Amino acid sequence: ACDGIYDPTRGYVMRGGREMENHFECLWDLFRSIPSLEIEGASVLDEYYWLNKHDPNYSLCRATINQGKDAHTDGKFDLSTKGAMEIMKLFMTPDEDLYDKTIEDVFDEEVFDSTFWMYWRSMFAFENWHSALEMKLYFQRFIHHISGLPDFSALKFTRYNQYESLILPMQKYLEAHGVDFQFNTEVTNVEFEVVQDKKIAKTIECKVNGTETGIVLTENDLVFVTNGSCTEGTIYG
């Protein structure tokens, strides 16, 4: 959902954005090869690195209460030993033992009443009834940023919204290398042909400016499909 835009009828809208950090290796490996649109001779990665070295992210007020007053979390987690052990137990539990469990099944108020849980759920949008396995996987992915939860110092950001800072430079780079972007196009189906041990995409069914059409494929074509999105069905209100 890196689609921040200015809409004359609604103002500036953006459906979502990435909370980035040092270990987005795939993203950074890609953008070290994409030229910056603003700094001649620099890559998007250079631009991002220099920005966060010069102006690192840091919050003096992590949470508010009573309509904007500082909650004075003061960088503390307020986790009891029992709560810390519940988190450690989840971290060590095999994935298959968590398939049908919610976070409420593995944590109790020792965790839910802690400032740590407020930090965690406000950063990663977790609810108590969400998947315990997803919670564990997030722990494993971001364990190196636990110390940065109380002040947001774990996070890094682009100069502008991620459409203008990431998507647009990549689009310009690809267009300069012959990529043909088709706008006002909705893919409705991909037809496959299955022959013995081969499954081949034969036709992309789509609508272009509301008119139904199709793209005939050959065995030499590569088709990459993103089936669904975390912002699918978004509405503004």
Roles of regions detected by a PLM:
Residues 15-33, 60:
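Elongated alpha-helical scaffolds
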Residues 2, 134, 234-237:
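Short, solvent-exposed loop/turn and secondary-structure capping segments
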Residues 140-222, 227-228:
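Helical element adjacent to the flavin cofactor pocket in flavoenzyme catalytic cores
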Residues 26-33, 119, 165-176:
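Amphipathic alpha-helical segments that form well-ordered structural scaffolds
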Residues 215, 232-235:
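Short helix/loop capping segments that flank catalytic or ligand/cofactor-binding pockets
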Residues 36-141, 156:
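Rossmann-like flavin
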Residues 9-14, 101, 148-157:
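Glycine- and acidic
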Residues 1-19:
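Conserved N-terminal glycine-rich FAD pyrophosphate-binding loop of Rossmann-like flavoproteins
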